[in-house]
C-alpha cells in the first residue's frame, strides 16, 4: 500500500512559501473543526443561542441581508480564530464580516478571503456544504488588501463537507486534493493532481432563474440541452457552489450563475467565492468568465461585491462567452 502523505508533509516539501504553508494549515484546522461540528449538529434545531455580533438567541442577518445560521457564525469564528494565530496574516474578509478584520499584526505578509460555510440552505435537508478561501499578499492596509483583484492571489482552494471531508488546494500551477482521515487526525493527500476535463456532459444551474437570463444566455443553454456539441447534457444541481463547482472540476461540464434581470451583477461574491474558485479552475486547466471577461481581472469597488460567473470546462465556458459576444456584435452592427 502506498505510504500516506499528510498535508503537513506535503506542504513541507512543496513550493509554497513558509507563511503560506502556515495559513493553509490553519485553514485546514478550521475546516476539520467545521466538519466535526457538522457531523454532530442538530441542523434542524430552531434554537439559535450562539452569540453572533451581539444577537444571542435570535437569527441575525449578515451584510447581505441573509439570515445567519448558528453554524455560519461558528464556522466564521473558527476560521478567524485559527488565522489570527498566524502572525503573517494581517487580516481577513469573510461573508459573515461587515468589514475586513484587521489583526494588527506587526509583520503582515498575507491577507485571507473566505466563505466559512457555503450552502447553508442545505443544512436542514442534510445536503452538501463547503468552505472557500483565497490567500493574497498584504497590500499595506486592511482596506487595500481586501480590494485586490483575484489575479493577485497566491493560493486558493475549498473544503467540501460530504460523505468525507475533502480539501482542494491550488497554487498558480497545480491543484491537489486531500481527504480528512479522522483516525489519523489529519488530511491525507490523494494520489493524483486534479485536472479539469476540456469538456463534459453536465450543467449545474438554478433552472428557476433561467427565464430571467438574457436571451443569448438562454439560447446557449438550449443549445447544450439539444446537443450543441454532439452529445446530450444532464443537469445536476446541489444548491451549494462548492459542490457544483467540484463536480465540474473533476467530471467536466459547467456551473452557471450569470447576470440576469433580477441580479445584474449575479449572485456570487467576487472576493471570497468567485475569485478563489476561478483561481482553482485556471490552475486545473479549466476556465471562468463573467460573461465579458476574466473574473480574476475585475477591480473590486467593495469587499462584498457580487459578480456573474460561468465556470467549468473550457469548451462550455468559451461557448458561453462566444454566445454573448456574438449578440453584442449583432446589436452594435
Predicted regions and their residues:
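Short beta-strand-loop/turn "lid" adjacent to the catalytic site in phosphate-handling enzymes
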Residues: 51-70, 104
Amino acid at each position: 500500500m502506498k505510504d500516506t502523505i499528510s498535508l503537513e508533509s506535503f506542504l513541507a516539501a512543496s513550493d509554497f512559501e513558509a507563511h503560506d504553508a502556515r495559513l493553509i494549515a490553519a485553514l485546514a484546522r478550521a475546516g476539520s473543526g467545521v466538519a466535526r461540528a457538522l457531523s454532530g449538529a442538530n441542523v434542524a434545531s430552531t434554537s439559535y443561542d450562539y452569540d453572533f455580533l451581539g444577537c444571542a438567541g435570535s437569527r441575525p442577518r449578515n451584510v447581505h441581508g441573509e439570515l445567519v445560521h448558528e453554524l455560519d457564525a461558528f464556522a466564521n469564528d473558527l476560521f478567524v480564530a485559527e488565522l489570527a494565530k498566524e502572525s503573517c496574516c494581517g487580516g481577513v474578509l469573510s461573508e459573515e464580516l461587515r468589514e475586513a478584520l484587521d489583526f494588527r499584526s506587526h509583520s503582515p505578509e498575507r491577507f485571507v478571503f473566505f466563505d466559512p460555510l457555503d450552502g447553508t440552505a442545505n443544512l436542514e435537508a442534510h445536503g452538501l456544504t463547503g468552505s472557500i478561501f483565497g490567500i493574497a499578499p498584504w497590500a499595506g492596509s486592511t482596506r487595500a488588501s481586501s480590494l485586490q483583484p483575484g489575479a493577485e492571489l497566491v493560493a486558493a482552494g475549498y473544503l467540501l463537507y460530504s460523505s468525507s471531508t475533502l480539501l482542494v488546494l491550488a497554487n498558480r500551477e497545480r491543484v491537489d486534493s486531500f481527504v480528512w482521515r479522522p483516525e489519523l487526525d489529519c488530511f491525507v493527500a490523494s494520489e493524483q493532481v486534479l485536472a479539469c476535463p476540456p469538456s463534459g456532459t453536465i450543467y449545474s444551474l438554478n433552472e428557476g432563474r433561467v427565464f430571467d437570463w438574457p436571451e443569448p444566455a438562454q439560447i446557449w443553454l438550449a443549445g447544450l440541452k439539444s446537443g450543441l456539441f454532439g452529445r446530450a447534457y444532464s443537469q445536476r444541481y446541489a444548491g451549494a457552489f462548492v459542490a457544483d463547482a467540484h463536480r465540474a472540476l473533476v467530471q467536466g461540464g459547467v456551473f452557471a450563475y450569470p447576470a440576469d434581470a433580477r441580479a445584474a451583477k449575479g449572485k456570487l461574491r467576487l472576493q471570497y467565492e468567485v475569485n478563489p474558485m476561478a483561481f482553482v479552475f485556471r490552475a486545473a486547466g479549466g476556465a471562468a468568465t463573467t460573461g465579458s471577461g476574466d473574473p480574476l481581472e475585475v477591480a473590486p469597488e467593495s469587499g462584498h461585491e457580487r459578480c456573474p460567473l460561468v465556470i467549468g470546462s473550457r469548451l462550455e465556458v468559451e461557448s458561453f462567452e462566444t454566445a454573448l459576444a456574438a449578440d453584442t456584435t449583432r446589436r452594435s452592427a
